Amino acid sequence: MTNRVKLDITAANDLLPSGEPETNTWQSTGNDPFFRINYPVLRSPIIVVFLECDHRDIDPQAYIQRGSGFTEKDATPLPIGRRFVIIADVGRFGINCALRIDPATFPCTFEFSVETYANRQKAERAISLRKAEDMAEAIRCDLGRLPRFRPNIGLPSLRRSRNDAAAFAQAQYQLAEALPATLPASDDTIWLSTVVPVYNAPKRYLDDLLRSFENQDIPGTQLILSDDASTSEETLRWYDERAEDDRIQIVRNTTNGGIAKATNAGLSKATGTWVALLDHDDVIAPHAFKVIANTLAQHPEARFVYTDELVVDDKLAPQGVMLKPAYDAVLLTGVNYINHFSLYRRERLERIGYLRLGFDGSQDYDLLLRYLEGIPESQILHLPYLAYWWRRTAATYSQKFIETATAAARAAIKDRFARGGTAVTVEPALTNTLHRVEFAVDNETDWPKISIIIPNRDKFDLISTILGNLYERTDYPNFEVLVIDNGSTDPKVLELYADYERTRPGFRALIKEEKFNFSRSINRGMFNASGEHFLLLNNDVEVIESNWLKEMVSCLNFDDTGIVGAKLLYGDDTLQHAGVITGLGGLAGHWYLNKPSNFGGPMKRLHLRNSMTCVTGAVMLISGECARAIGAWDEENFTVGYNDVDYCLRAYKAGYRIIWTPYACLYHHESQSRGSDKSGESKIRFDKEKESLRRLHDTGAFDDPALNPGYEKGKSNPGLQIPRTLAAARLRGPSRSR
């Protein structure tokens, strides 16, 4: 049997070869003969079966795999006749990897052969030629698009997550298949060079990589394999067999110099305008080059593009997805969330000197940090497409040599800040293998003065707790406290104020009888403050660790940061605030509410600092510059609810960065001081605030850069949302100096 892509065709049950193998002649010896056609996860999409019986009519059947083996309900009877052309579209990838053909239900002799084709057009040309030769009267049986994946019904949770990933990928690739191709503007014949360092790669890895490259449906690309002096006979034999293969360029280095050196050797041979780097066990996703080319054509200003990832096992079965946020320079200091598939401009790579030696295990991270320096964020694009498959196995480099890779990553991060003239140390994050940048402060007197603004009325237990926490459990050396009181009458509270005013310099209680309006309270506090920056603090908050305020203030060292939010927990140690997603529920909402306090979230992002569009006003630091630029809080439209979202979105649209940090962690006994918004006048007021938020910020259509468009927006714990359209490339958002 002739195959362009390797097929494992098993003659099972009641079948014997008849005559010479090249004749493809078989004899059925019973009433249930069948062939099982097995194809790989990555394959050519069109399978054509030629079936012919000269001496009598036969009654073939096709069995289509739907996830539970081949059963009678999967059978598709075909017409009765003597000659058949059976066509099946199995797609370019999938985890359903078999088709069964029963040639007849009785003893007979017949010819059976199978071909695969890269597309429908090539298949039709081959069918026409075959019909002209000897199958003019063949019955055409088109099985259509076969299921690529198993149905997601009644699966346990782990298998469901894997199946969701597969279905998500399938939907993206089907949408991309119908996409017309547009080549990006380029002065070079090759617009994209893919460079892969190789060392002792198994043959099947190289086969998968090459097949995934060949399956791309756009011209103008090259694949460069740079071998790091492999010793494996299997790898070397694979090279020898492809010595004359003009589809790939193989660079065979004579000495083993490591990944960085081998990659640089490959980069020196690249001729494309753009360059992508992959590992030898990676796979290029279906239609990836076409989707990327279209994006580059639409964004000629782009200087860097990165994509999402499909996580697969050793046999390429989908296990999960890595859906990334839009570019986040703060998150990047904690983890290389960008990784692959990333596109660099070749001329800039040449200018910075390619990869540096000495960063083994994190050489890509170091390259990324160096490459992105000085590039405006408006030229850094995130393409939400699963453009490559990361084969995650026990032998993955970053797992096998994790200590070396972690140390190299921290050295690269420290070096990145040093080049900008900022001294930092890099410590473990809440996940030990991830990273936390700590900015150096030479003297305690160098910390800027912070004006802490606390709205309050009565509530002795709450206000006494937070004031005690500030003065006794907070190690920040330079702050004042302004309690903005809208009419306390409790003698204990008034006495507490008087005591603090006598004993704590910088403490003031500004009392004015009026209806509670959070925005007005904040405006009063900021007007009367004397600090360099402003910290808004609810009265129902408790300090957990003493360094929380230093952490929040230190985040202002990140470029253009205007607002910083903290990690807040309910009293039962579950998450109350890990950042606000604009558009969640059509308005804005906290993501991952009620998760355990140590919950890491997607890509462990909740263990790291993140750029957000919004954070809660319960614990919110505002830089003086941002406060002056954005102006007053909106006392008319947002008296109690959503005022923090409105203020953050105004700052975000003005180009200020908003950071959420998990390293400042406090308890928040939410709304104990003002009650519920679910009934009476409070509900009427809250409904008006919702309408104001929609009207002023169009939150229903807001694309929050912190949330990948592959996640649903209907609930706090967002799951995968099967796409109906391909999401466009995304930017972080409005920019100041960025």
Outline where the language-model segments fall.
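C-terminal, non-catalytic tails of nucleotide-sugar-dependent glycosyltransferases
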Residues: D134-D188, I402-I450, D572, L584-S611, ...
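Nucleotide-sugar donor-binding/catalytic module of glycosyltransferases
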Residues: D142-A405, D415
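Short, acidic, metal-binding catalytic loop of nucleotide-sugar glycosyltransferases
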Residues: R211-G220, G468-N478
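A short, glycine-/small-residue-rich helix N-cap motif at loop->alpha-helix starts
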Residues: T254-K261, L267, D360-G361, E513-R520, ...
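A recurrent flexible, glycine/aromatic-enriched loop bordering the glycosyltransferase active site
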Residues: A260, S268, G320-L343, E347, ...
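Short beta-strand-to-loop acidic/aromatic patch adjacent to the donor-nucleotide binding site
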Residues: G272-V283, G531-I544
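Conserved donor NDP-sugar-binding/catalytic core segment of glycosyltransferases
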Residues: H287-Q319, E377, V541-L587
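A short, conserved alpha-helix in the catalytic core of glycosyltransferases
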Residues: R348, G358-Y385, I413, W548-M552, ...
